[in-house]
Amino acid sequence: WKIEMNAAPRSPLSRQQMAVLMAMLVALMPFSVDAYLPAIPEMAQGLKADIHLIEQSLSTFMFGVAVGQVVGGSVSDIKGRRPVALVGLAVYLVSVLLLSMAQTGGQLLLLRMVQAFGAGMTVVVVGALVRDYYEGREAAQMFALIGIIMMAVPLVAPMLGAELQKLGGWRAIFVFLLAYAVLLLGLMAGFLPKPAKTEKIGRDIFAVVAGRFKRVLQTRAAMGYLFFQAFSFSSMFVFLTESSFVYMKLY
């Protein structure tokens, strides 16, 4: 087996351009979650499904993201960040294309999970890419730039989704996500260079990955942060799941 070293080739992009590209990759998540929230009631009617079944697509999406990040993070250490991101985007692209043609609530749930798996594989490499290409203060500045750009996405996504719904119904939202994925795939393929160096590891890669997860699980501070973040996400998604339906019924 080979595992990618931290020493990656210098990116052909400037620091600002790299920050925008990384932010666009991370934005895949909030766009995928927030853009279709205003359309949940219409989706339930169009698919002739119970509203609560459509709401479950948020839960299935987060499950798929979790699995995609675990798989993508581990594989990216072996095969490199670029191929994992490209494969993740390809999976995302195909699933969104099929989502735009979904006919039942069951198809929606299944395809949302596949979409989330691709999104998880893609997004998980962002932090690693920044650490690969930048060090010290420069890396901190990159993360700050990405954070600034990312702050606007959860605000814009629901409004964008509502406008797309007015123009072409709820399926137009997934057509937009398809176009966005195609754009990202082209940018990643064209501007993210292949890793310059690899190193061999002399033991079973699965044992190496399992050992890393074991160290994380045995670190008390890390587990505290994980549980805190999990409960924060739980509260947020309870609100996201119910809010659009309540607002549209009351206002």
Segments (PLM) and residue ranges:
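Conserved MFS/SLC helix-loop-helix module at the cytosolic interface between two early adjacent transmembrane helices
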Residues: V67-G106
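Juxtamembrane intracellular "pre-TM" segments in multi-pass secondary transporters
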Residues: N6-S11, P195-Y225
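Short hydrophobic/alpha-helical segments at membrane-entry points of transmembrane helices
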Residues: G106-R112, G224-Y225
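Helix-loop-helix hairpin linking two adjacent transmembrane segments in secondary transporters
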Residues: Q103, Q107, G136, A144-G190
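Helix-breaking motifs and short loop linkers at transmembrane-helix boundaries and internal kinks
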Residues: G46-K48, G80, M101-Q107, G118, ...
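Central cavity-lining transmembrane alpha-helices of secondary-active solute carriers
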Residues: S59-G72, G127
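Extracytoplasmic
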Residues: Q17-I51, G72, F239-S244
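Cytoplasmic helix-loop-helix junction between adjacent transmembrane helices
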Residues: L111-M150
